[in-house]
Amino acid sequence: MEQIHVSPAGDDSWPGSQDRPFATLERARAAAREAGGKAVVHLRGGVHVLTRPFELGADDSGTVYQAAGYGAPEQEEPVISGGREITGWRVRDDGVWLAEVGDLDTRQLYVNGRRAPRAAVPGLPGTVTATETGYVTDSSEPLSWQNVEFVHRGVYPWTEARLQVAGIARAGGSTVITMARPGYEWAYALYQSVYEGNASIGPGLPTSVENDPSFLREPGTFVLDRARPGAHVLMYLPLPGEEPASARVVAPVLETLVRLAGAREVALRGLVFAEATWLRPGRPEGFVHYHGSGFYEGGPVERAELGEGSYVTYPLSSVTVPACVQIEDADGVEVTGCRFTRLGATGLSVSGGDGVAVRRCAFDTLAGGGVTVTGTRSAAIEDNRVRGTGLELSGSPGIAISGTRGCVVAHNEVTDVPHCGIVAGAGEGTHILHNLTARTLQVLADGGGVYLSGPQGDSADTGAVVRGNVIKDTVTPYNFGLYTDYGASWVLVEENVVMRADNTAVLHVGPPLENVTYRGNFWDADPVGHDDPPSGVTYEGNVTIADEGALTAATQAIQDRAGVRS
C-alpha cells in the first residue's frame, strides 16, 4: 500500500512523505488515486480546514484515511473542520464582544471548544393572539427585533418546530408579527389535532425566541446580527474569565464536511469531524418538524386516529435532517474510532449500499442526531457512544434506522439526549442488541429509550429482535423504556432490563401491534396494558421487581454485557 501523509503544516508541492507531507486532503486524494486506490492516507494532528466538502467516490475505492499513528499510543488527533476562526474582536462598554464577519451565515458558535447557545428569551411578551399569518401582541417590545427565530417546542408532544419572522409592525395599539412563508403555512397545515376534546390548529405560541441583540443577557451566549446584508456582526457575551485575545472562537461555515458516494472498501479511522452548520431552519421554509429526524415540506397530510374522537395529522412524506458526514450507496465502508462533534445537523448518515460498519465512534455536541441509517443492507452500528445530541433539533434520536435490511445496532451507549435513544422505523431483520440507554427523553415526550414502529418483517424469521438492552431513566412524563408503536409487527422483545422509567412499556397503541412478543424482560414496574394484552401481543415470562437492588442483582449478567465493549 502506498503511504501518503498530509498535515496542516505541509505543502502541496512536497512529495507527501512523512517528513514532507502534503497540505490538503484534495492533494492527498489525487495521490491516492494515482496509486489506484491502494493507499493509506495518514492525517497528522491539527486542524485540517476545508473550504468546500471533501468528496470521495468510486475512484477512491480501497483507500484508507486514518489518523497518523492510528492504533498506537502516540496516535495523533486530526480535526477535519468546516469552520472559520473569528478574530478582530472589539469589546463594547457592556462587555459584549463584536466582530465584523461580512456575509458569514451560521447557526452555531464554539468558544474554546465549548458550544455557545444562541441568545434567547422565553416566548412572546404581552397578551398574545395567534392568527393565520402570525401573532398580535399588545407589547411594543418586539418592534425592535430583527432576524429572530421562533421555537415551538411540544406542538405535538414529540415535535419542535423552528419558524422565521417576515416582519413586525405597529397597528394601532398592537404589534403585528407576520411569519415567513411557506414555513408558517406548512406548520398550519401539519399541526392539527384533537385530544381529549380540545382542538388545536397551527404551531401555537412560540415557547422561546432566539437571536436578537437585546437577548444577550446570559454569559456564554451569542447573536449573529444580519440586519445589514453583507455586513453581518457577530456578538458574544463572554463567560467570566474569557478574553478576546486568548479565546479561540470558531463559527461553522460548511454544511457538509465529507460526502462518500458510490465507493467500495473505503476506511475512515481515528478522525475528528467538527464545525459544520445547517442553515435550512433559518430560511423562510423554517423547520416544520414532525417526528424523529423527519420534517415536513408541504404536501398531503392524513389523520392518525387515536380513539375517542382524538387525532393528530401527519405528513404522507417527509424529509430527513441531513448529516455533516454522508455515506451514500457505498459498499464495505468502515468508520472506526472517529469523533463527530460541534456539528449543526446529524453527525453521520448512511443511505443505500451494503455492509457499512460504524464502530467505536463518539458522537457529541450535535444540533441533530448521532447516526441515521436508511435504505441500506447489512449495516453494523456497534460500540459507539452517543451523548449530548439533539441540542437544537430536539426530536432527533441518538441512533435511527429505517428502511433497512439486516441492520445490527449493538453494544452502543446513548445517554443525555432530548428524545428517543434508539429508533427503528419500518424495515426487515433489524437486531437491536445489548445497548445501554440512559437519561433519554429529557425534552420531548411520547418516545422510548428503544422505539420501534411499523412492520419489521413478514415472519418471525425476518422480523426484528430487541434483546439484552438496558434502558434507564426515561423519567419525564408520557415516555416509555421500551416502545413498540404505531403498527409495529413481527418484533421479539426479550431479556431486556428497564429501570426508572415513567412507563416501562406499553402494549396498547394505534394502529395496533401485530405479532409482537414480550418475553423474559425485567423491569421495576408493570407495563401499561400488561394485565390485558391485545390480541396481537404475546406477553409471557416477564418479571417485575420493584426493589432496585433486587432488580440489579437479578439482571447483573444482562447489565454487564450491555453497552460499549472495552
Provide a role label for each language-model segment.
Residues H5-D329, E334:
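Extracellular polysaccharide-degrading/modifying enzymes targeting complex plant/algal/animal polysaccharides
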Residues G37-A39, D59-V64, R259-A267, Y296-E305, ...:
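Surface-exposed loop/turn motifs in large extracellular/passenger domains
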Residues R52-P53, E255-T256, T277-R283, P322, ...:
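Short glycine/acidic-rich loop motifs that flank beta-strands on beta-rich extracellular proteins
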Residues P122-G123, R153, E275-L279, T476-R565:
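Extracellular beta-rich repeat passengers
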Residues A245-V249, F273-C324, T336-G337, T346, ...:
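Acidic/polar low-complexity surface segments
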Residues P397-I399, T404, N412-V417, G421-T484, ...:
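C-terminal structured domain segments across diverse proteins
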